[in-house]
């Protein structure tokens, strides 16, 4: 360290003085030197000093399965055992492939049809242990002919491994089907053109799990809405869509390239005349059957040893390098902690004192000057909004946290979505969307969607957590003769049944045995709140009137109906979108095979399509008893347990359905309701997502304040509907539900913050590694600086957490070479104290406590100082990368005897 010279430092000023020294110093000649300690001139980053750079032959690195030792072949090897080196410029496959994408409707995966891809996880799993795998649906090949909206069950069972391979790729070049090329069905191309973890695909062959060597999966964030395959589906111009996609591998024989190119120092283990061995501490994956490289991965002129590469498991790319490390110099990235070289060796040091200081104010400073601080911007993408990168700018100035929060939120609120702007109409499209103007002044589009961004910023001062929450907003209007936006079904009702029901069975007093039987009622043609909802008889409340029945809303029991009655087919499903068709029934095992049935024990099936040898064509009621897997379940006949009133249809009262108009003569609502069903077209939401409703009138005796508040989605019904549990309330009379209800819904909008640019607010907001290529968040509706980046694993964050920001009235300069303070709590080796002010100026000048360190006897040598700027609690100050400086006066004693005038 001592041989590293300070560069660009203020000159050291030396003054020999031929007189008596300061008090308490020996009376002899002294030398005063002023030294500027400036954190800008510390060594910021650790770095290596290199000797020879060796250019390796292409693909000269040899890998072995489950072995972290790699062998590098090089002729006339110049290295010896124990030498320190780093690997550099190691690369893997970078391929341009055409028409490889395929996805089935309802699938959670997109399949890449990539022959001999080489991304094997061989040796990581037990092929005979089926517990290591889970079945998945809708990933089999599409048929030769299909419709985009067909539901096409898989013919072959497929599985995915439950382990984690850490194999990833970067995908780019995917274009979409719609006019703006932004979507394939409901899948944003932004999602596809990104970093992905590869999901290996398996099938069961001869009792063993086998990985597909010719395709793999990428997991989606939603179920695909269409069937799609490159080269088959047509775009808006009715032409087949062809995709030429770039696949960049991030692994080489299973080893992440970040590990191979990490610039981590490696020690040569075994050096021979023509090779060296290194332990990279990450085992390779070498599949003996499905090789990593194939002949199609090379052009004929790129390399001349293709057979060796493939069969001997070589890699590394065309231009791998080895750098010989001669020395490692420690760096100090944090301006609050560093070692500072004084530029010379001071000897016989008698005293050191501080004489000036300049420190950044603890307030956050925002500016846009490229020559100074340039940190006033934010960049982001929206998942469902095309491949546009948005930019906003904050007005330069000094902000407290509350003012910064308001400024950021206002800047988002004034940024329209790109498709609503004048600039969107022009070509070519810009790389960065900024300073745009609305095409028309209305704030909502024709579908009720809000045209501007809504982003809330929450700052948790105690933990330095910053949370961005992004929302969309839509206004939905109740329209005549259309489904209501908000439907609140009655939870409990008293029904008066028709006397005709009793006539069907005269053996009992009531229309059904209330002690042993369960009555379900489903009314599609009744009032606004009760229609299309399932109700079941409440055995806990008895009525004296034999025709009055108390029923409760049932949203959990799924009922599938497929019968022939009155020479008409009656096919309907209640509480589920699954329809009883395309099934197979085994009457010996009572086993039903139905692709992706999504049923559970206790669900009910009413049908005459399950063939029973003793009652062919008869309607039976079945109860689901066991779920075998996602495609199979068992049932049992329960003819006497359940009775059904479904519209004008009676089931279970006789062998055949009985029909009459109006079996239910009167409906009286009881008590509180507890769910709302929201009609929100193409919502793209999930269970657990928060929404906020405003503007609604009272509905079905539920007060406005119960409806107009924040809610959590409890159930997804389909692409256009979801369910919410509402709080208890005091029912009101005279609901306004007959009026024209205009309802505003605020819902999560997944987006991605991008801090890879060097002029962002990221550091001020405590985000890590700002300005690096990895500083990009995943698509989330709520993004925190405590979360992982898109390509980052949790263990990679350990050394990157932000230090705690200053919240005291002063801080210390620690320096073990210049200790002057004692009895100061947890902080040791304190030299002096810097006092803070309430000024909003960028910097604090000369707020130090005058301090001097006297050495008696004189210090023989002083050449560097270990500096830490810390709080009284010992934690380092976070200057957000801003630097500081202070001046020291160093007094040395001269060996010369001073001359005294007579």
Curated annotation (Swiss-Prot):
Residues 1-11 have a biased composition (Basic residues). This is Uncharacterized protein R481. Residues 1-24 are annotated as: Disordered. It comes from the Viruses. Gene3D superfamilies: 2.40.30.20.
């Amino acid at each position: 360290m001592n041989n590293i010279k300070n560069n660009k430092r203020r000159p050291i000023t030396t003054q020999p003085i031929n007189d008596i020294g300061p008090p308490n110093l020996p009376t002899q000649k002294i030398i005063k030197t002023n030294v500027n300690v400036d954190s800008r001139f510390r060594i910021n980053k650790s770095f290596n000093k290199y000797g020879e750079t060796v250019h390796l032959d292409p693909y000269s690195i040899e890998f072995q399965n489950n072995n972290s030792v790699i062998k590098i072949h090089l002729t006339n090897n110049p290295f010896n055992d124990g030498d320190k080196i780093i690997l550099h410029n190691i690369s893997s496959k970078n391929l341009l492939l055409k028409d490889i994408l395929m996805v089935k409707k309802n699938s959670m995966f997109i399949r890449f049809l990539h022959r001999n891809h080489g991304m094997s996880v061989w040796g990581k799993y037990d092929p005979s242990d089926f517990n290591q795998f889970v079945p998945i649906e809708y990933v089999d090949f599409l048929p030769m002919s299909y419709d985009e909206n067909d539901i096409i069950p898989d013919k072959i069972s497929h599985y995915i491994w439950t382990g984690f391979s850490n194999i990833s790729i970067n995908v780019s070049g995917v274009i979409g089907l719609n006019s703006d090329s932004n979507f394939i069905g409901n899948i944003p191309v932004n999602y596809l053109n990104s970093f992905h973890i590869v999901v290996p695909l398996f099938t069961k062959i001869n009792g063993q799990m086998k990985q597909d060597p010719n395709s793999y999966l990428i997991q989606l964030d939603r179920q695909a809405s269409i069937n799609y395959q490159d080269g088959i589906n047509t775009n808006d111009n009715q032409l087949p869509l062809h995709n030429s996609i770039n696949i960049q591998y991030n692994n080489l024989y299973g080893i992440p390239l970040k590990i191979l190119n990490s610039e981590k120092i490696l020690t040569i283990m075994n050096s021979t005349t023509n090779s060296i061995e290194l332990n990279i501490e990450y085992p390779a994956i070498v599949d003996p059957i499905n090789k990593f490289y194939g002949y199609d991965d090379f052009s004929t002129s790129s390399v001349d040893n293709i057979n060796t590469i493939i069969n001997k498991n070589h890699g590394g790319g065309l231009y791998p390098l080895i750098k010989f490390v001669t020395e490692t110099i420690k760096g100090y990235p944090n301006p609050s902690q560093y070692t500072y070289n004084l530029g010379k060796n001071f000897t016989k040091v008698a005293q050191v004192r501080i004489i000036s200081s300049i420190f950044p104010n603890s307030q956050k400073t925002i500016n846009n000057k490229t020559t100074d601080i340039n940190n006033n911007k934010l960049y982001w993408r929206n998942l469902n909004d095309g491949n546009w990168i948005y930019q906003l700018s904050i007005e330069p100035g000094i902000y407290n946290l509350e003012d910064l929060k308001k400024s950021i939120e206002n800047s988002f609120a004034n940024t329209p979505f790109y498709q609503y702007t004048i600039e969107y109409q022009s070509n070519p499209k810009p790389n960065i969307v900024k300073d745009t103007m609305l095409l028309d002044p209305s704030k909502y589009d024709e579908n009720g969607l809000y045209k501007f961004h809504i982003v809330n910023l929450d700052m948790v001062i105690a933990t330095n957590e910053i949370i961005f929450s992004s929302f969309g907003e839509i206004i939905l209007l109740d329209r005549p003769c259309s489904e209501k936006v908000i439907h609140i079904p009655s939870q409990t009702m008293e029904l008066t049944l028709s006397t005709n029901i009793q006539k069907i069975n005269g053996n009992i007093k009531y229309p059904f045995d209330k002690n042993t039987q369960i009555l379900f009622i489903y009314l599609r043609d009744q009032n606004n709140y009760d229609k299309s909802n399932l109700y079941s008889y409440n055995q806990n409340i008895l009525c004296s009137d034999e025709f009055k029945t108390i029923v409760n809303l049932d949203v959990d029991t799924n009922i599938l109906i497929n019968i022939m009655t009155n020479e008409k087919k009656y096919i309907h499903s209640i509480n589920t979108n699954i329809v009883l068709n395309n099934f197979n029934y085994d009457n010996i095992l009572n086993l039903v095979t139905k692709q992706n049935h999504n049923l559970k024990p206790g669900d009910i099936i009413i049908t005459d399509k399950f063939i029973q040898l003793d009652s062919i064509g008869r309607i039976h009621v079945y109860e689901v008893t066991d779920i075998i897997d996602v495609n199979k379940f068992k049932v049992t006949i329960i003819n006497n347990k359940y009775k059904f009133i479904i519209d004008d249809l009676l089931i279970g009262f006789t062998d055949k359905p009985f029909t009459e108009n109006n079996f239910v003569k009167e409906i009286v609502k009881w008590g509180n309701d507890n769910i709302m069903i929201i009609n929100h077209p193409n919502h793209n939401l999930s269970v657990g997502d928060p929404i906020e409703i405003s503007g609604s009138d009272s509905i079905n005796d539920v007060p406005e304040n119960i409806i107009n508040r924040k809610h959590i989605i409890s159930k997804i019904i389909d692409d256009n509907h979801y369910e919410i549990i509402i709080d208890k309330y005091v029912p009101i009379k005279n609901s306004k539900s007959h009026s024209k209800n205009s309802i505003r819904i605020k819902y999560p909008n997944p987006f991605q913050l991008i801090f890879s640019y060097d002029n962002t607010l990221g550091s001020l907001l405590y985000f890590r590694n700002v300005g690096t290529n990895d500083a990009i968040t995943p698509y989330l509706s709520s993004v925190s600086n405590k979360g992982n980046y898109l390509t980052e694993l949790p263990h990679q964050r350990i050394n990157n957490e932000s230090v705690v920001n200053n919240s005291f009235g002063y801080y210390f300069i620690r320096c073990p070479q210049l200790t002057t303070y004692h009895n100061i709590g947890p902080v040791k080796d304190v030299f002096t104290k810097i006092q803070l002010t309430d000024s909003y100026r960028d910097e604090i000048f000369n707020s130090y406590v005058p301090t001097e360190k006297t050495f008696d006897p004189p210090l023989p040598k002083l050449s560097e100082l270990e500096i830490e700027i810390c709080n009284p609690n010992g934690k380092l100050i976070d200057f957000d990368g801003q630097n500081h400086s202070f001046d020291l006066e160093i007094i040395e004693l001269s060996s010369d005897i001073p001359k005294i005038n007579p």
